[in-house]
A protein has these predicted regions:
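Acyl-thioester C-C bond-transforming condensing/cleaving domain
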Residues: 2, 18, 29-37, 86-98, ...
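ACP-dependent fatty acid/polyketide chain-elongation machinery
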Residues: 1-66
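A glycine- and small-residue-enriched flexible loop/hinge segment at structural boundaries
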Residues: 39-90, 139-153
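Generic hydrophobic secondary-structure packing signal
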Residues: 22, 26, 73-80, 139, ...
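Structured loops at beta-to-helix junctions and adjacent beta-edge loops in soluble globular domains
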Residues: 10, 105-107
Length: 204
């Protein structure tokens, strides 16, 4: 008989609603999250709208500590993780931390951080890059920062399989629970809206 695996908490940040109640309400009412972009200049582009999360303030959810060097993608996923943990009433303890895992799906990772870091290295020279910002350029940085912030000491995996990354992460997590590799898993996906991702789709 297959093991019963359940979802106990949900954390969501989306352009049409942050928090599961707001997001579900928007879906039921058919409210779109597509708005004018404010994160970067679109004046020279034909398209000026996207699904942007407006007025995002990670500190209001997480407090100011440890946020200064994190990029937007990592902040988004840490807030979503906190919302999910709170919704599940799940507290990571010394007793369960090694049996708790993290699986995160992403298509492009922290593409803004990668681009900005490389731009500085190419234009100004490698010695002018800020080494403190380098961790943001690694694709598994957001997932790793979840484990660091919430002291999760079980396995930590980033799935990058294109547009199915988050679904693949969910399947990966389900398998690990089925195989008794973990008792609880924080699983999700993240993509940030930035100029680089916008241009990628704009050029299609």
């Amino acid at each position: 008989m297959a093991k019963r695996i359940v979802i106990t908490g949900i954390g969501v940040l989306a352009s049409n609603g942050s928090g599961k109640e707001a997001f579900w309400g928007a879906l039921k009412e058919g409210r779109s999250g597509i708005k004018d972009v404010s994160l970067f200049d679109t004046s020279n582009m034909r398209t000026k709208k996207a699904g942007e999360i407006k007025d995002f303030d990670a500190a209001s959810f997480l407090g100011p500590k440890g946020l200064r060097l994190l990029d937007r993608s990592t902040k988004l996923v840490n807030v979503a993780a906190k919302l999910a943990l709170d919704d599940a009433h799940f507290k990571v303890t010394e007793e369960n931390t090694h049996d708790t895992g993290v699986v995160l799906g992403t298509t492009l990772g922290s593409i803004w951080s990668i681009s900005e870091f490389d731009k500085t290295a190419l234009i100004e020279g490698p010695r002018y890059v800020n080494p403190a910002l380098f961790p943001n350029t690694v694709i598994n940085s957001p997932a790793s920062q979840i484990s660091i912030r919430f002291v999760i000491k079980g396995f930590n995996t980033t799935i990058a399989t294109g547009f199915t990354s988050s679904l693949d992460a969910l399947k990966y997590a389900r398998d690990f629970l089925e195989w008794d590799r973990a008792k609880a898993i924080l699983v999700g996906g993240v993509e940030e809206l930035c100029l680089q991702t916008y241009l990628g789709f704009y050029k299609l």
